[in-house]
Amino acid sequence: HTLGFIAGSSVSNFSHRFHNEDVYMPLTPMFHVHGWGFPYMATLLGVKQVYPGRYEPKKLLDLIIQEKVTFSHCVPTILQMLLNENKKIKYDLSKLKLIIGGSAMSKNLAEEARNHGINVVSAYGMSETCPFLTIAQIPSEARKSSQRELIKMRTKTGKPGPLVDLRVVDENYKDVVRDNKSTGEIIARAPWLTNGYIKDKQASKELWKGGYLHTGDVG
């Protein structure tokens, strides 16, 4: 899991490349699924890590500036709180790469984050996938696109990470047609996904029906 996402986030043409010159600070509590992967990546890469304690918008922004934080992740509600606070203090956040998950990031929120200088993209996953399956990417050749097109790219579900086998299937487990119209359930396989639920064999069996983890999400 950790090595897979290090490989995926360290490629040179990836807009959110995570490398040993970054300074990492999580913007979500450690008990949240957001905190289950990146701290291990940061440790393996030898990255400086900052852990804020109380999650107060002003304190988080102060630490980002004081510690020169360059890489983080959070849910949309936390990002909105930071942006609201930064309207008052007007810190330069142009060095910050931020991954958003937990719920969909709206185009308006992404645009507001960009107006504050934050390099923000969406990711998709769930607690059972610990945490990411996919992440939005802006390849180097697309970085001169219009702001409108870039916002679209930033808010997309993105592409599967390394070692992730992702499918969208119908009720018969057949892959749906890729026509931007047909929908089905998102199912996944990867080495780090949960095996099941404690003391709930039936739910665990249903989760992995057909050899894939069933997200219950429509794609």
Label the model's feature ranges.
Residues T28-H32, G125, P191-W192, G210:
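AMP-binding (ANL) adenylation modules
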Residues T157, R178-D179, E185-G219:
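Conserved ATP-binding/catalytic segment of the ANL
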